[in-house]
Amino acid sequence: MPEKKTAASAANEYIVRNRMTHWQKTYPHWVSVASIIILLLFWEAICRCGLVSSLFLPAPSQIISALLTMLADGEIGVSLAASIYRILIGFAVGSLIGLAAGLVTGTSALADKIGNPIVNALYPIPKIALLPLFILWLGIGELSKVTIIALGVFFPVAMNTYSGVKNVDTLLIKVAVSFNASWWKTMKSVVLPNALPMIFAGLRLAAGTSLLLLVAAEMIAAQVGIGALILHYGDLMITDRLMAGVIVLSLLGLLFNLFLQWLERKAIPWKNI
């Protein structure tokens, strides 16, 4: 009997190990690079063969040529500078206010009762729908665009910070209080470090939201910016320049996300241990 059990358990372990390799298998980085190159070559081929009109889908080589021309003319530089200014200010303001709101509502029962229902009620509203109202209140200048970005950033940061604070082990807080730690010391040494993973998850969500709101705001209420540039060439049906603007926007989002990942590794070095 023991031998049969041993054989059965060994067979079961072998089956589980084989199934787990499907989930745990890793591939070298060149696989990702090769897949992108193959996709671009296929895209170039169907455009060169005339299967798709360049008006609807320009070839990658045509888009790169348009991008280089726009870079040389300074058109991309001016638009990118305006967009970076708006997204950085909006993201910083929204993140700081969201972080403060999440910490306060997460640590104060009264603030939780007052603030949490308001945040949950306002969160589902599409923020871009409020842009005309902000333009009416704040004018068509930079303030309305920065404010709508800050508002979009505020909610994911506030809600994730709140969840991170609520998920902190109460035993750790009790230990800090038993050693006569002040409220600020408890927040700094116990609550904030344990809530950081959730806070950074909120920041990453907010980064995507801020980019979407930036483009929408620039398309509606801006003369300069990547969103305004894309809309301009869309109206003129100059597709290669439109796609060049989309590529710049994609690279901006990628760099923003990489920066947040780097910042997270610096702030939470123990996360990947």
Regions found by a protein language model. Name each.
Residues 125, 165-171, 175-195, 235:
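Short helix-to-coil transition segments within interhelical loops
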Residues 1-37, 258-273:
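Transmembrane alpha-helical segments of polytopic membrane transport and secretion proteins
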Residues 17-25, 49-92:
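Periplasmic/extracellular loop-to-transmembrane helix junction in inner-membrane transport proteins
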Residues 89-119:
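Transmembrane-helix boundary motif in ABC transporter permease subunits
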